[in-house]
């Protein structure tokens, strides 16, 4: 089974890669540059992940996507929402819904997965692997099982070899993802979750908070934070 992987270097995509390699041949990983704040970090860390596993890495530039996007992920005049762990656990639904709206990029996952399907078909790969997961599906519908099923139906018409989406995290929350990734020895020290692209993760954006909560609840120390702390000693 050969596949193309969507790789942002975030917790989910790195974990999905580790799981996929346990069961299949990942032919290539694709990282997308659509002008997001964290793009340099995503490319840097994705490259390290691919070097770790010996996988070909391609960067796909989508400058047109940033030009039609008014989101805090791209527009630096807009503030990226800051959340607390309590907001994620006990906060009202509108807090995470408002955060999701602030970082929403029009049809981003739809664009990414269709490009990946083109690579998959051209290289004789049967699957596109994505880090879609059950936790984020609650606020991002393009992470859901329904989205995956709809895309599979579309690909049955738009690809000659019937490419399918493989989402190994689709029923998992972030705590389960961390535990599985650590079990498989995924190089999470090379994963970048922050919406920002500063030298250090901000620690307060929704993505950082979900990662922080997941590691706390899992009982594991975050290898990325530990690696940076060790480097400073």
UniProtKB/Swiss-Prot annotation:
Its cofactor is Zn(2+). It is an enzyme of class 6 (ligase). ATP binds at residues 7-17. Zn(2+) binds at residues 194, 202, 205, 208. Its EC number is 6.3.4.20. The keyword Electron transport does not apply. Pathway: Purine metabolism; 7-cyano-7-deazaguanine biosynthesis. Keywords: ATP-binding, Ligase, Metal-binding, Nucleotide-binding, Zinc. The keyword tRNA processing does not apply. It comes from the Archaea. Belongs to the QueC family. Catalyzes the ATP-dependent conversion of 7-carboxy-7-deazaguanine (CDG) to 7-cyano-7-deazaguanine (preQ(0)). PANTHER family: 7-CYANO-7-DEAZAGUANINE SYNTHASE. This is 7-cyano-7-deazaguanine synthase. It comes from Methanococcoides burtonii (strain DSM 6242 / NBRC 107633 / OCM 468 / ACE-M).
């Amino acid at each position: 089974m050969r596949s193309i992987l969507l790789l942002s270097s975030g917790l989910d995509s790195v974990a999905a890669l580790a799981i996929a390699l346990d069961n299949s041949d990942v032919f290539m990983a694709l990282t997308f540059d659509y002008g997001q704040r964290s793009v340099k970090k995503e490319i840097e860390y994705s490259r390290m992940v691919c070097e770790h596993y010996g996988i070909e890495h391609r960067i796909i530039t989508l400058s047109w996507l940033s030009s039609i996007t008014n989101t805090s992920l791209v527009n630096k005049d807009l503030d990226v929402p800051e959340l607390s762990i309590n907001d994620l656990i006990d906060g009202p639904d509108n807090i995470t819904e408002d955060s999701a709206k602030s970082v929403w990029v029009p049809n981003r996952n739809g664009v990414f997965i269709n490009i990946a399907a083109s690579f998959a078909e051209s290289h004789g790969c049967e699957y596109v692997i994505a880090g879609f997961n059950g936790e984020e599906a609650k606020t991002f519908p393009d992470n859901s099982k329904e989205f995956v099923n709809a895309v599979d139906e579309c690909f049955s018409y738009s690809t000659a070899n019937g490419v399918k989406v493989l989402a190994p995290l689709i029923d998992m929350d972030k705590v389960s993802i961390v535990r599985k990734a650590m079990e498989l020895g995924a190089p999470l020290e090379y994963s970048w979750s922050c919406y920002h692209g500063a030298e250090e993760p901000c620690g307060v954006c929704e993505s950082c908070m979900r990662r922080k909560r997941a590691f706390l609840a899992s009982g594991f120390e975050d290898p990325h934070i530990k690696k940076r702390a060790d480097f400073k000693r």
